Amino acid sequence: MKGKKAAIALAAIMGFGAVASLGACGGSGGSGEIDFWYSASVPDGRIISEMIDAYNNGQGKEDGVHVTGDNRGSVSRTDLMVNSPNVIMLSDEQFKQFAVEDYYLDLTQYYEEMPGNYKEEEIPTSFTRAFRIDTKDDANGKRMAGEGAAIQGIPFGVDPMIYYYSIDVFEEAGIKIISCEEKDLEKKYPGLQPHGYAEYTAENGAKPPVEGATVSENLAGESVYKIFNNLIPMNFEEFRYLSKCFTKSYTDNDSTTDYGSATHHWFSFGWSVGGDCVGYDGEKYSFTALDSSANYLVTAKDGVTVNGKHYAAGEVVRYEDKVKQADIATMQGLHPLPSQQTAMQEFINLSVPRDKTGGMVATGYGVATAINESVDALYSASNKVAMVSGRIVQTTTLEVAYKGQYDIALPTQWREYKGGSVYYKGEETFGNEYLKVIGKQYAGTVYTGELDKDAESGVPFVGRQTGYGSFSALMIPVNSDSSNYEAAWKFIRWAASEEGQRIYIKTGNVPNQSALALSDEYAAIGSGLNYRAAAIAAQGAEIGDWAYFNNGAWVDKWSGNFNQALRLGYTTPEKFMQDFAGIANTDIGKVSIVMNGRW
């Protein structure tokens, strides 16, 4: 193993074959017989086999390459040490732990010299960034990952976070469900504003804003038209209000569900405003799960330069740049967004009960369950919910017993509306909080439900549209047959191109190609389900905290307390940070990886 790595390094130093375009990368002249190891369910395995057959009978003949697939339960370190397969498929969670041990071939030169039909510019940056990591530490002992780092894996697809919701529960509440992207809303539904969930007044003879909407009563006892758009994210206020509408303790037990929602991961809350559980200050990472500093949205038409980095209009400033720009709070062309602490508190409040019982020290909204957060919470006998977060491939589970009874929507997003989203009847508590009704007056002004925007540039005050995704990628183990490196690359570039991805989408995973993901072809894979939402969610998806560094072990020591004691009201955010910030910082201090380009 060491001898083979040394030979590869020596060849790179001496630049062997640099004058030959296709031969420059090395690894040519082998048999062309490629072993491809992957892990997939039986149905997905059949689809991957179909993809392999398509390559062998098509592009593979032109490439002089033949691929044999092997659906294995898992790939271990041992498999990468000796007699490795020519190509492997791994998840983002596995990727970095083997990368820092030098088990992958650097694919940068292969991509630069023989990309075939695989083009990074056709793929979301977060996909490609997830599998870039340098092959050695820099002078400061840091291993750079992300933008600008070496290509060690080629993104193969993603299983993004989405929300499942019960169609029956929504319709019983009088909610009209539509599917319309924000860019098409004005043309297709001129009477609507860009909301995930909104209520329009039905009083004084007001007509429905969309055909098919019916009059029903909202939580405040008003006659309204309720509209749910599953292709526009709900903002924080809309999500908690709609969850409240489906929580028995707020509806005199009139709700058919115990809770409004179940959301296990905080990512779409914190990431949307520009926060994260870690922050890099240019020298080291710190545990920032409850960081109280404001975040910033760029609103200047021509962008703004912060800490030497230029940001375009609509982008959110990264943690490193905001903490190193001393005067950021007074800079022109920036709009403040909530802190990570505010976003995280919003997420925590969803599941913390509204009343203290049995040793609880905190209260919250109490509109979500933190006990059962799997997709079957939609239809469970206890802790039944109206909405539950999950991933798109979990439709397989729901289709078995609940076909036609549920659909898919986007994760939450920070979105600001003119005049705000809520009002209070009496004291400003969540129990007295209600969603503003479009068309009604508040403090003498008619609420229009319009997005709030910068007065000069027109940039809307919205955060990132994001959530976590479970990414997969294709790699060439460095300890595989080096004479077949080029053959292995030719298969990878085809499988990750539109032609290969067109077959792979049959698994339900969102393809890496944005155009294909957002096409009617992928949407049709859902057989009536709103797969368009999954495709949109995937465009802003990021790796979860378990995949930030060498492995997810650094999360384990604090995540249990976070998901149990903190989210159930048995501890406070302040006590959580007292108990776990030091532990998390110690573990983070042991990692050498720096995620370049990530906030």
Residue ranges and their predicted role:
Residues 38-45, 65-140, 155-167, 230-240, ...:
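Ligand-binding clamshell of periplasmic/extracellular solute-binding protein-like
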Residues 92-162, 168, 180, 184, ...:
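Hinge/lid segment of periplasmic solute-binding proteins
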Residues 507-511, 529-589:
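C-terminal capping/gating helix-and-loop segments adjacent to ligand/active sites or protein-protein/ligand interfaces
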Residues 164-167, 470-483:
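A bilobed periplasmic-binding-protein/Venus flytrap-type ligand-binding module shared by bacterial periplasmic
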Residues 3-11, 15-103, 112-120, 140-141, ...:
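Conserved N-terminal structural module of periplasmic/extracytoplasmic solute-binding proteins
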Residues 138-156, 188-328, 374-376:
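Extracytoplasmic/periplasmic solute-binding protein
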Residues 492-517:
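Periplasmic-binding protein-like
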Residues 236, 240-247, 281-371, 398-400, ...:
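Glycine-centered hinge/linker elements that transmit conformational signals in sensory
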